[in-house]
């Protein structure tokens, strides 16, 4: 397998909480190939209480509440924490972007900002065998 086709992995996280996504889902300019392209957040296990509150609130539309990484965060390669905007409130941290896929999210935010839309990526919360997980519906930013 070619090194550029491998999914980025953070071995410090449990195998079922590393998130998912691949550069194969994007064109050369990090534009999603399909409207159905998703990116599953990593490190959601510690956030199960917050995710349960989101589900219990019954909010239909969820969007990310994140900003682009600062030069300091880029330099130290800090994890990109994700919060959700649900209705009228911003939640606590619900996960992080999988290692190596931060440029995909940065590009989606700048693409939304460039066309004059709010810099919020649609999201959904899914139930898995390992608990609640957050999928960013990044294909909808095309």
Which functions belong to the PLM regions below?
Residues 1-142:
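Conserved active-site motif detector
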């Amino acid at each position: 397998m070619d090194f550029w086709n491998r999914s980025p992995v953070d071995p410090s996280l449990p195998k079922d909480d590393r998130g998912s996504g691949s550069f194969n889902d994007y064109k050369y300019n990090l534009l999603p190939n399909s409207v159905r392209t998703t990116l599953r957040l990593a490190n959601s296990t510690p956030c199960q209480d917050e995710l349960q509150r989101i589900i219990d609130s019954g909010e239909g539309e969820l969007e990310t509440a994140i900003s682009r990484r600062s030069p300091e965060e880029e330099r130290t390669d800090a994890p990109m924490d994700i919060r959700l905007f649900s209705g009228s409130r911003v939640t606590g941290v619900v996960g992080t972007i999988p290692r190596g896929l931060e440029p995909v999210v940065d590009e989606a935010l700048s693409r939304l900002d460039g066309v004059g839309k709010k810099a919020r990526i649609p999201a959904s919360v899914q139930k898995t065998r390992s608990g609640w997980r957050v999928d960013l519906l990044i294909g909808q930013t095309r």
